[in-house]
Swiss-Prot record:
InterPro entries: EF-Tu_GTP-bd (IPR041709), EF-Tu_GTPase (IPR050055), EFTu-like_2 (IPR004161), EFTU_2 (IPR033720), G_TR_CS (IPR031157), P-loop_NTPase (IPR027417), Small_GTP-bd (IPR005225), T_Tr_GTP-bd_dom (IPR000795). This is Elongation factor Tu. Monomer. GTP binds at residues 19-26, 81-85, 136-139. It comes from Prochlorococcus marinus (strain NATL2A). Residues 174-176 are annotated as: G5. Transmembrane segments: none annotated.
Amino acid sequence: MAREKFERNKPHVNIGTIGHVDHGKTTLTAAITKVLAKKGQAEAQDYAEIDGAPEERERGITINTAHVEYETEGRHYAHVDCPGHADYVKNMITGAAQMDGAILVVAATDGAMAQTKEHILLAKQVGVPALVVALNKCDMVDDEEMIELVEMEIRELLTSYDFPGDDIPVVQVSGLKAIEGEADWETKIDDLMTAVDASIPEPEREIDKPFLMAIEDVFSITGRGTVATGRIERGKVTVGEEVEIVGIRDTRLTTVTGVEMFRKLLDEGMAGDNVGLLLRGIQKEDIERGMVLVKKGSITPHTKFEGEVYVLKKEEGGRHTPFFAGYRPQFYIRTTDVTGQITAFTSDDGSNVEMVMPGDRIKMTGELIAPVAIEQGMRFAIREGGRTIGAGVVSKIIE
């Protein structure tokens, strides 16, 4: 089947749904597609399609990050539905890293829960610049005062994590009732999208910098070759261009023979696009998640760096005990965990400390077991046993 060309006539914005498990993120995502489909601005998708993670569906948990697309009057959106369950924070980090803004879904029946807080913290860590709150399941709460209390609580919570809690729009919605076609609740979905259009700033694309895409997934297409998927972080890539594969193993050169987005062919992919790149002469085994595709000669992999790190408090889901020099966690860099060692540290004011306590801010020297495309100013998470225990930024490359 010939694939249609992707029309690029509106600004493109990446957003997603975040929030506590069972607060209705996936239902709301389905409701947005359904309401916008009535105006011809989306293809309606039902809950099961978006929730398409068969291996975990039985337990009612969404694992995989689902991608949907839709348009409003002024924008084209790519929307990721991020899993809510704490076990899938790893996916949340890769998903949230792809967001220019997020819709924080909070059930009016419950208010803020543990993962609501965890996701707000993660949004802060991975640099999600703006949030809009969807107060969901409002059809189930008769008492207007109750809804107002939940709204106040959410605003205070956002402010405590350095988001502008007083200014962030809070829209009362019911994903379920909107899907069922109740006109008043459909209007609320329109209100939500109006708030998203107005409050999530159009991202400044990094289009003029050298091309870089972190690889999220790799698969083979019979008769065509190997495809690497991911979000283009910066720059642009055109069909026929030579790119380097950097990180984990020795750097290799390849040619991009195809660029696809939402199953449509493009002449080029640019910063902010979620694309699949077809690579010449590369086997599926040659590349893996965590490597990056970059403009030839623009980046070299490193193993040693200095970073500024905030170590999460116990209450934020961090460690309960201190750690010492020589500590070996995972460093979550772009799309993958890399084992490393914190070889030395001082407190953030430069004074010597013997150990690092949960809640501390430190300057640290880290050394990775495999070379990765790390850069100054880049953010990373420090993780242990599948949970985030620290958030940091690379302050200096050593080697």
